[in-house]
C-alpha cells in the first residue's frame, strides 16, 4: 500500500461563517450545562430549596453562575433544567434543555447515567465505553466535582441521570450516527466554554495571535488545536513565553501563512491523531464540514511502519482517527506509526510554507498528558 504526496488544500470556511463588526459572544458547553443542572437538583434535594442559579467550576479554575430554568421534585428525587446558551456559535444544541434527575443511592459514591436524548456509544474509537452514555471525560469530572461541593461522596451515594428533551432530533444534525452514537446528542466540552470557532472572525484571531508573537520579537510560534494540546505544548517547550502558543482550532493553514508573512523562522505543531491525519492528507483547514480523516492514509502509514496487512485493513476500516490510534497502540505500533504520521505532517507544513520556516511536529495522547510521537526537534 502506498500513498503519494497529497495536494495541498485550504478549503473555504463553512457557510455559517460570518464577519461581524463586534466581538463574538462565547457560550457554554452541554457538559457545563449538565453540571449546573446536576448541582441545582442536588442542592434542592439536600436543602429542600430550589435555587434560582448555581455556581460551578470550569476546568481552568474559573467559576461561573448559571440560571436554573426549572427545579422540581419527582418520584425519584429532584429534576433541574439548565438551558444551553451557545453564544454566537452555530450550534444545533443551542436552546437545549440539559436536565439532571438526582436521587439517593444506597452505596456511597456517584453513579452517572444517560437518559432520553443522550446518545449511547455503539462503536469503539471515542474513548468511551461501548454501550454507555455519550458523556465525555471532562463533563464527567465536572459533574463529580460539583456533586462533591454539596455532599461527601465517601459517606453518601448519589445517582445522576442526564437527559435532553428532543436530543434525538438534535442529533440528526450532528455526526453522531456516523461515529456510532445513537439515540441522542453527546455531552461534550473540554473547557466548559463554547467559542464560535467556525467563523471568519476566529480565523482572524488566529492570524492576529501570530502577528502579536512576531511583534514581540519571537521567532517561533507553537500551533495547538485546543486546551489539552496547548498544555502539552507548554510542557514540551517550557522555555517559550505564553505569547508563542496559539490555539488554531481548524485554521492551521492561516497560522502558517501568517508565520511566513511576518518573518518568523519556526513553526511547531502539537496535536492529536485525528487532526494530524487530516493535515497529513494536505488539508490545512480541518473543520469537520470540510474534511474527514483519510483512513486509507493511516492504513498506508501502518504498512510503512511495519504493520501487518490485517492491521492495515483494520486501521483503514476504523471508525475514527482515535480508533486507528488505539489499534496502533494495541499492536505496539503507536511509536513507529505515529512518528511516520508526524513526518508526513511536517512535510506538508514545510511545503505549504514554501520551506520558509523550520517545522517540528508532535503527537500527544488524548489526555494531552504525554508525547507519543514526533518529527523534527523531538525525534529520537
Swiss-Prot record:
UniProt-listed NCBIfam families: cbiD (TIGR00312), PRK00075.1-1 (NF000849)
Organism: Salinispora tropica (strain ATCC BAA-916 / DSM 44818 / JCM 13857 / NBRC 105044 / CNB-440)
Reactions it catalyzes: Co-precorrin-5B + S-adenosyl-L-methionine = Co-precorrin-6A + S-adenosyl-L-homocysteine
Keyword field contains S-adenosyl-L-methionine: yes
Top EC class for this record: transferase
Coiled-coil residue windows: none
Biological processes per GO annotation: anaerobic cobalamin biosynthetic process; methylation
Protein name as annotated: Cobalt-precorrin-5B C(1)-methyltransferase
EC number: 2.1.1.195
Known pathway: Cofactor biosynthesis; adenosylcobalamin biosynthesis; cob(II)yrinate a,c-diamide from sirohydrochlorin (anaerobic route): step 6/10
Sorted UniProt keywords: Cobalamin biosynthesis, Methyltransferase, S-adenosyl-L-methionine, Transferase
Family from the record: Belongs to the CbiD family.
Superkingdom assignment: Bacteria
GO molecular function terms noted in the UniProt entry: cobalt-precorrin-5B C1-methyltransferase activity
Amino acid at each position: 500500500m502506498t500513498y503519494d504526496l497529497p495536494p495541498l488544500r485550504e478549503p473555504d470556511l463553512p457557510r455559517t461563517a460570518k464577519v461581524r463588526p463586534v466581538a463574538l459572544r462565547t457560550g457554554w458547553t452541554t457538559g457545563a450545562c449538565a453540571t449546573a443542572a446536576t448541582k441545582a437538583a442536588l442542592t434542592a434535594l439536600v436543602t429542600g430549596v430550589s435555587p434560582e442559579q448555581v455556581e460551578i467550576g470550569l476546568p481552568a479554575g474559573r467559576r461561573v453562575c448559571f440560571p436554573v430554568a426549572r427545579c422540581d421534585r419527582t418520584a425519584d428525587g429532584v429534576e433541574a433544567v439548565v438551558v444551553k446558551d451557545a453564544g454566537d456559535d452555530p450550534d444545533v444544541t443551542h436552546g437545549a434543555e440539559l436536565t439532571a434527575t438526582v436521587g439517593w443511592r444506597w452505596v456511597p459514591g456517584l453513579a452517572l447515567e444517560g437518559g432520553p436524548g443522550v446518545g449511547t456509544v455503539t462503536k469503539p474509537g471515542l474513548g468511551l465505553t461501548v454501550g454507555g452514555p455519550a458523556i465525555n471525560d471532562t463533563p464527567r469530572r465536572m459533574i463529580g466535582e460539583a456533586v462533591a461541593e454539596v455532599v461527601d461522596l465517601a459517606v453518601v451515594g448519589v445517582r445522576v441521570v442526564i437527559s435532553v428533551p428532543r436530543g434525538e432530533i438534535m442529533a440528526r444534525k450532528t455526526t453522531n450516527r456516523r461515529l456510532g452514537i445513537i439515540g441522542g446528542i453527546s455531552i461534550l466540552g473540554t473547557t466548559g466554554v463554547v467559542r464560535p470557532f467556525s467563523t471568519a472572525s476566529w480565523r482572524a484571531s488566529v492570524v492576529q495571535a501570530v502577528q502579536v508573537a512576531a511583534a514581540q520579537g519571537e521567532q517561533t510560534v507553537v500551533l495547538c488545536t485546543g486546551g489539552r494540546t496547548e498544555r502539552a505544548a507548554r510542557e514540551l517547550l517550557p522555555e517559550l513565553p505564553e505569547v508563542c502558543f496559539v490555539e488554531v482550532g481548524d485554521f492551521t493553514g492561516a497560522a502558517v501563512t501568517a508565520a511566513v508573512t511576518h518573518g518568523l523562522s519556526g513553526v511547531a505543531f502539537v496535536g492529536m491523531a485525528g487532526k494530524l491525519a487530516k493535515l497529513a492528507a494536505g488539508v490545512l483547514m480541518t473543520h469537520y464540514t470540510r474534511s474527514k480523516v483519510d483512513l486509507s492514509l493511516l492504513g498506508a502509514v501502518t504498512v510503512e511502519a511495519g504493520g501487518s496487512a490485517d492491521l492495515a485493513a483494520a486501521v483503514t476500516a476504523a471508525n475514527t482517527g482515535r480508533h486507528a490510534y488505539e489499534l496502533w497502540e494495541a499492536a505496539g505500533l503507536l511509536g513507529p506509526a505515529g512518528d511516520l504520521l508526524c513526518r508526513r505532517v511536517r512535510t506538508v507544513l514545510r511545503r505549504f510554507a514554501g520551506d520558509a520556516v523550520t517545522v517540528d511536529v508532535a503527537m500527544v495522547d488524548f489526555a494531552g498528558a504525554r508525547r507519543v510521537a514526533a518529527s523534527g526537534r523531538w525525534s529520537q
